[in-house]
Design a protein with these regions (language model features):
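Oligomerization/assembly interface segments of phage tail-like spikes and tubes
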Residues: 68-89, 138-152
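Solvent-exposed edge beta-strands and adjacent loop segments
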Residues: 9-81, 122-136
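Residue-level signal for secondary-structure boundary sites
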Residues: 90, 113-115, 152-154
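A general structural signal for short secondary-structure junctions and capping/turn motifs
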Residues: 72, 95-97, 106-107, 134-138
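Short, conserved charged micro-motifs
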Residues: 89-96, 155-157
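Mixed-charge, glycine-accented linear interaction segment located at domain edges/termini
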Residues: 120-159
Length: 159
């Protein structure tokens, strides 16, 4: 029996908040080997350049667990939705590069947690918009959807 449950969980305090604060992109393959201790990445052997995108509101990360008893398989399908307000040429060019690439993605939430999306396979942009909005209060900016399918959920990161 290699799949034994090892612990439970009590109801935590109501101190968490939703949302993503910052998203970082690094070129695929630049992480090198990750050191994973107790389900947490504590370091990488590579020297990736991380490119920071600050986001506010309407950005989220969700991981669906897909498991098949018939096939004996389980994988994790993570979807990262990001919204960037305001349009400018430099951002549009970077988003074009990201859309053509398969980056590793680090996500910082508003609870101070960092997650690594696409450790093994990278992430793929599978949608997005460049929008001007119609009314004065509408979004003018960019939306981007990044998807990563992995054999493990996004790892917590300590460094």
């Amino acid at each position: 029996m290699g799949c034994l449950i090892t612990s439970g969980r009590k109801v935590p305090c109501k101190s968490a908040v939703g949302g993503i604060k910052t998203i970082y992109f690094a070129d695929y393959g630049t992480l090198g080997n990750a050191t994973i201790v107790a389900g947490e990445i504590t370091g990488v052997s590579g020297t990736p350049d991380w490119f920071q995108f600050d986001v506010k509101g309407n950005s989220s990360m969700e991981t669906a667990i897909t498991s098949s008893r018939e096939n004996g398989t389980t994988f994790y399908d993570t979807t990262l939705n990001m919204t960037l307000t305001f349009q400018d040429k430099a951002t549009q060019e970077e988003l074009k590069l990201i859309a053509h690439a398969r980056p590793h993605v680090a996500v910082e939430d508003y609870n101070g947690n960092f997650f690594l999306v696409g450790l093994e396979n990278g992430g793929d942009v599978n949608g997005g918009t460049i929008v001007t909005g119609a009314a004065m209060g509408d979004l003018t900016g960019y939306t981007l959807t990044v998807n990563a399918q992995e054999t493990a959920p996004p790892f917590f990161v300590t460094s």
